[in-house]
């Protein structure tokens, strides 16, 4: 699927009437699994990127180049649209422009730019936000850098849990007026907060890890929520599986005694072994 088609598929979700849950993806294998299972799109979170690329916690240590390369690998591996958490855009508004250019070229279907002050400021234990003016400048720079008009740009704010609901709405309205395609809110905890956000804005809404009170997807859809990110369990599950397998091997378990391993059939499927074999036969004269 061409980049434009993937971006069009994501736009169709935003303009639709349902609230969907994306797959948390972080590498070529995970995005292929998500694609095979029929997820509508993948979400490449910033915390997951830090884990998959560096093995570090989510403290803004990865570089734009590292992020874009991982997106490029995933975009090559599967046709599933990917929304990339581009964090703060890796610097000021001019850095945001470069971020959009690189992620668009890497095949991202969409990306989010947030207003969190990153990296963490000296002496500040709690998350901080950039000013409304700086946040808006970043959004405008992101929109100006977009070459393919189908690339989805989502303005994200963490104000609900850092400053106030009113601040979150004011920031979102500024991003909406600037021309973003959707609004992403983190820290929304109650139906009342969502009602206020939905009433004040007109764009499609995305929520980050909504709590149980916001677990009814029909209710979310009626409030214009089109994306509900359900955390990033897959990489945690993969980490646990590797830990258990290596622990068993260290303790002397024989290969055939190991449990919880992917079958040969599943490995062939996620590595597209049949496609590779067909190409080998066609281009190398290697009989299957």
UniProtKB/Swiss-Prot annotation:
Q: What domain of life does the UniProt record list for this protein's source?
A: Bacteria
Is Metal-binding found in the keyword set?
yes
Asked if Iron is a keyword of the record, the answer is: no
- Give the EC number(s) listed in the UniProt record: 4.1.1.112
In the record, which residues are listed under signal peptide?
Answer: none
What InterPro entries has UniProt attached to this entry?
Answer: ICL/PEPM (IPR039556), Oxaloacetate_deCOase_bac (IPR023687), Pyrv/PenolPyrv_kinase-like_dom (IPR015813), Pyrv_kinase-like_dom_sf (IPR040442)
Supply the Pfam families for this chain: PEP_mutase (PF13714)
The Gene Ontology terms for molecular function here are: magnesium ion binding; methylisocitrate lyase activity; oxaloacetate decarboxylase activity
Where on this chain does Mg(2+) bind?
85
| Cofactor binding note of this UniProt entry | Binds 1 Mg(2+) ion per subunit.
**Catalysed reactions, semicolon-separated:** oxaloacetate + H(+) = pyruvate + CO2
Query: What keywords are assigned to this protein?
Result: Decarboxylase, Lyase, Magnesium, Metal-binding
Kindly list the cofactors needed: Mg(2+)
Group of enzyme by EC: lyase
Per the UniProt entry, what are the Gene Ontology biological process annotations, in alphabetical order?
oxaloacetate metabolic process; propionate catabolic process, 2-methylcitrate cycle; pyruvate biosynthetic process
CDD domains per UniProt: ICL_PEPM
Which positions does UniProt annotate for substrate binding?
A: 47, 156, 232
Protein family according to the UniProt entry? Belongs to the isocitrate lyase/PEP mutase superfamily. Oxaloacetate decarboxylase family.
| Function field | Catalyzes the decarboxylation of oxaloacetate into pyruvate. Seems to play a role in maintaining cellular concentrations of bicarbonate and pyruvate.
Complexes and interactors: Homotetramer; dimer of dimers.
Q: What is this protein called?
A: Oxaloacetate decarboxylase
Name the species this protein comes from: Rhodopseudomonas palustris (strain ATCC BAA-98 / CGA009)
The organism's taxonomy opens as: Bacteria, Pseudomonadati, Pseudomonadota, Alphaproteobacteria, Hyphomicrobiales
């Amino acid at each position: 699927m061409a980049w434009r088609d993937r971006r069009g598929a994501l736009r169709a979700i935003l303009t639709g009437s349902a609230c969907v849950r994306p797959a948390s993806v972080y590498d070529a294998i995970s995005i292929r699994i998500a694609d095979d299972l029929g997820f509508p799109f993948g979400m490449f979170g910033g915390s997951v990127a830090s884990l998959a690329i560096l093995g570090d916690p989510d403290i803004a240590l990865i570089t734009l180049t590292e992020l874009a390369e991982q997106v490029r690998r995933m975009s090559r591996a599967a046709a599933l649209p990917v929304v990339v958490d581009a964090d703060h855009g890796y610097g000021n508004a001019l850095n945001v422009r470069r971020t959009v250019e690189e992620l668009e070229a890497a095949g991202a279907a969409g990306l989010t730019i947030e207003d969190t002050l990153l990296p963490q400021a000296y002496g500040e234990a709690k998350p901080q936000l950039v000013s409304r003016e700086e946040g808006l400048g970043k959004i405008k720079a992101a929109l100006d850098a977009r070459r393919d008009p189908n690339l989805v740009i989502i303005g994200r704010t963490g104000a609900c849990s850092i400053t106030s609901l009113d601040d979150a709405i004011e920031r979102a309205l500024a991003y909406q007026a600037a021309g973003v395609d959707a609004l992403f809110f983190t820290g929304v905890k109650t139906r009342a907060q969502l009602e206020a956000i939905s009433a004040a804005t007109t764009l499609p809404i995305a929520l980050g890890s909504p709590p149980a009170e916001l677990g009814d997807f029909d209710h979310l859809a009626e409030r214009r929520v089109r994306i509900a990110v359900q955390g990033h369990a897959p990489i945690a599950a993969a980490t646990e599986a590797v830990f258990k397998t290596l622990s068993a091997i260290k303790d002397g378990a024989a290969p055939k005694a190991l449990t919880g391993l992917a079958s040969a059939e599943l490995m062939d499927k996620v590595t597209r072994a049949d496609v590779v074999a067909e190409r080998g036969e066609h281009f190398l004269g290697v009989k299957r």
